Amino acid sequence: MSRSPLIARTVPALRRAADNLRKRKATIALVPTMGALHDGHVSLVRLAKRRASRVVVSIFVNPTQFAPTEDFGAYPRTWKADIAKLAAEDVDIVWHPGVEAMYPEGFATRIVPEGPALAGLEDRFRPHFFGGVATVVGKLFTQCRPDFAIFGEKDFQQLRVVTQMARDLDLGVKVIGSRTVRERDGLAMSSRNVYLSPQERQTATTLYRAMKDSAGRIRAGEAIASAMARGAATIKAAGFVLDYFEARHAETLAQVTSRKDGPLRILVAAKLGTTRLIDNIAV
């Protein structure tokens, strides 16, 4: 039988609840989300439960990672459905702050990540994004003080940036990546998929097919540049506006020219209509 999670809306309330768990020798896993939860998020919660004895899920649509032209105001907010999903998974605490709790009046500090994970992918097209992500995740880590934090591999560059930040700042949190959950036709689950029209939803599967085709060609010995050019052409022909479609080193995100350069990851970002989709797969 599921139970309702404790809902914390202020930092002191969250810390009291988390401290009470620690007093009982609990280990804590944090699952940061922006809400609009789907089965991909549920998979993160289930991984968190396997890694720790107690689970905290944060729901906060973070304004600092959106540019003025992006979809902060329109981002789906489904609070009642989210809580029902989390209760069904026996989540212990839901951290649901308002903007004023995360960024009170006078807030003036920002974490700006640098280094190899800033590899000219999302950071090239959304230069504001990772500063906003690093700042809010850094705050979530210091507010909750979890032992583990679970992030989806769908946002692969974000996973690398957050892992680097936690290590560099000695935050004492082990960041764990969770495999991307897909629809039956291969589309990566995303809260933004609700923006797609029925026709766009059918077309959106092109991203996964193009990645799989390019990955297969690379494994078969085709030159990376050739295989990636084929995939990019397929995506554009389907009607996408392509931001990037690249093969990178899976650990460092450095550019590669040969399979011998190390384990590879194909990453893509493209806009279909008004909806921007991102995805990635291992080669």
Curated annotation (Swiss-Prot):
The keyword Nucleotide-binding applies. It is found in: Cytoplasm. It catalyses: (R)-pantoate + beta-alanine + ATP = (R)-pantothenate + AMP + diphosphate + H(+). GO terms for molecular function: ATP binding; pantoate-beta-alanine ligase activity. One of its GO terms (biological process) is pantothenate biosynthetic process. InterPro entries: Pantoate_ligase, Pantoate_ligase_C, Rossmann-like_a/b/a_fold. The active site is at residue 41. It comes from the Bacteria. Keywords: ATP-binding, Cytoplasm, Ligase, Nucleotide-binding, Pantothenate biosynthesis. Its EC number is 6.3.2.1. Transmembrane segments: none annotated. Pathway: Cofactor biosynthesis; (R)-pantothenate biosynthesis; (R)-pantothenate from (R)-pantoate and beta-alanine: step 1/1. Beta-alanine binds at residue 65. One of its GO terms (cellular component) is cytosol. The keyword ATP-binding applies. It holds the Pfam family Pantoate_ligase. ATP binds at residues 34-41, 152-155, 181, 189-192. The reaction proceeds by a bi uni uni bi ping pong mechanism. Belongs to the pantothenate synthetase family. PANTHER family: CYTIDYLATE KINASE/PANTOATE-BETA-ALANINE LIGASE, PANTOATE--BETA-ALANINE LIGASE. Catalyzes the condensation of pantoate with beta-alanine in an ATP-dependent reaction via a pantoyl-adenylate intermediate. Homodimer. This is Pantothenate synthetase 2.
